[in-house]
Amino acid sequence: MMHNSTEESEWEVRPGGMLVQRRDDAASSDHKPLQDPDSASAAFAQTIRITVSHGSSHHDLHISAHATFGDVKKALVQKTGLEASELKILFRGVERDDAEQLQAAGVKDASKLVVVVEDTNKRVEQQPPVVTKEMEKAIAAVNAVTGEVDKLSDRVVALEVAVNGGTQVAVREFDMAAELLMRQLLKLDGIEAEGDAKVQRKAEVRRIQNLQEAVDKLKARCSNPFVDQSKAAAVSTEWESFGNGVGSLNPPPPASPSANVTQDWEKFD
């Protein structure tokens, strides 16, 4: 008995010689494409194992080769408990961007990455200091005192020039300069300052104290002009020469010329 090709495709011989009709699901399974073994292995190869070093700790991660370094950070957050913003990932000594893919950077199976934890305290120190209204007010007050002290400093310099030049300066000039300096010192003492304003105030206090010391020294020199022994000796010598020379600052002439003059007068007589 002859069967056409269609009928032959609907029957199959089972072990033992039994002829049975082929089931639909078996027939449909014959038409399903078989999975390419190469593509299956390629899909398996998409997952790689990398080692991430964090100080003395090492973490093994199984991750897709197409993942990014940001994905690695997320995986490390779960293992270490650190914040992703604190982590820096280095591969081959170069810090990698979060959006960069592992495969594009050359990361392969068994590659090693290094994680560095950023010092958050250092990052906070680098931020510009917050200037409050109170700080601005303190800085302005210290600057105002600085301007007044500049004027008083010029006055002290003028007093020093006068004293060094031998000018007799009234005592009240030194007392007035000292009083004005003390007023500015009291102003600084009443300024509540922090940060840069505090440093500036401290420097200005030291400056005023130095000027006060200079005024006291000038006043002492003016009250006792011979306090400088070298200058006193020079003035005394000049006065002695003036007395001995009878109206001349030069020392008196030697006795021998006087004898000659006497002899001339005798000859004249």
From Swiss-Prot:
Coiled coil: none annotated. The keyword Chaperone applies. Detected in stems, leaves, flowers and roots. Keywords: Chaperone. Residues 21-35 have a biased composition (Basic and acidic residues). SMART domains: BAG. Residues 1-40, 241-269 are annotated as: Disordered. Pfam families: BAG, ubiquitin. One of its GO terms (cellular component) is cytosol. GO terms for molecular function: protein-folding chaperone binding. Disruption phenotype: Early flowering and shorter vegetative and reproductive phases, with more branched roots and inflorescences. Early senescence. Enhanced susceptibility to salt stress. Hypersensitivity to light. One of its GO terms (biological process) is regulation of stomatal movement. It comes from the Eukaryota. InterPro entries: BAG_chaperone_regulator, BAG_dom_sf, BAG_domain, Ubiquitin-like_dom, Ubiquitin-like_domsf. Residues 138-219 form the BAG domain. Induction: By cold, by salicylic acid (SA), by abscisic acid (ABA) and by pathogen B.cinerea attack. Residues 46-122 form the Ubiquitin-like domain. Co-chaperone that regulates diverse cellular pathways, such as programmed cell death and stress responses. Binds to the ATPase domain of HSP70/HSC70 chaperones. Interacts with HSP70-1. This is BAG family molecular chaperone regulator 4. It comes from Arabidopsis thaliana (Mouse-ear cress).
